[in-house]
A protein has these predicted regions:
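Zn2+-dependent cytidine deaminase-like catalytic core
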Residues: 36-124
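Short beta-strand scaffold segments in enzyme catalytic cores
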Residues: 23-32, 36, 110-111
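Secondary-structure boundary/capping residues
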Residues: 20, 24, 71-72
Length: 124
């Protein structure tokens, strides 16, 4: 699938911001216009003096702070980079993120597969 190199570059740069061993980045875009980027990260909170860590998926991170009703018809690209950043890997969105994107109205979801190719997520 041919996407703008700017969109792919933005997704890779977002993935590089992750502190996880497995680095994922996501870009919400409409046409060639990038609306938001996100990466997988740890969100921690303190509750009764106990620390709890929760992971925030790259797709969720990219959607934070955006007006969801304005995203209908937008697209998303999700990429995974290796630790050495030498190649792209499988970044197929999980079921929870797919349901969230469907609920919001994200029209097209693209991701990198095991071969590092950009593919479109098949609709159910």
């Amino acid at each position: 699938m041919a996407l703008s190199t700017g969109i792919l570059h933005a997704a890779i740069e977002a993935a590089r911001k992750s502190t996880y061993r497995v680095k994922l980045g996501a870009v919400v875009f409409k046409g060639k216009r990038i609306l938001s980027t996100g990466w997988n990260q740890i969100r921690s909170s303190s509750l009764k003096h106990k620390n709890y860590e929760n992971s925030l998926h790259a797709e969720q991170s990219a959607l934070l702070g955006l007006e969801w009703k304005k995203l209908k018809g937008c697209s998303m690209l999700v990429v995974k980079i290796s630790r050495a950043e030498e190649r792209l890997g499988n970044a197929c969105p999980c079921e929870m993120c797919r349901k969230l994107m469907d609920y919001i109205g994200i029209k097209n979801v693209f991701y990198t597969n095991e071969e590092g190719e950009i593919v479109k997520l098949k609709e159910n």
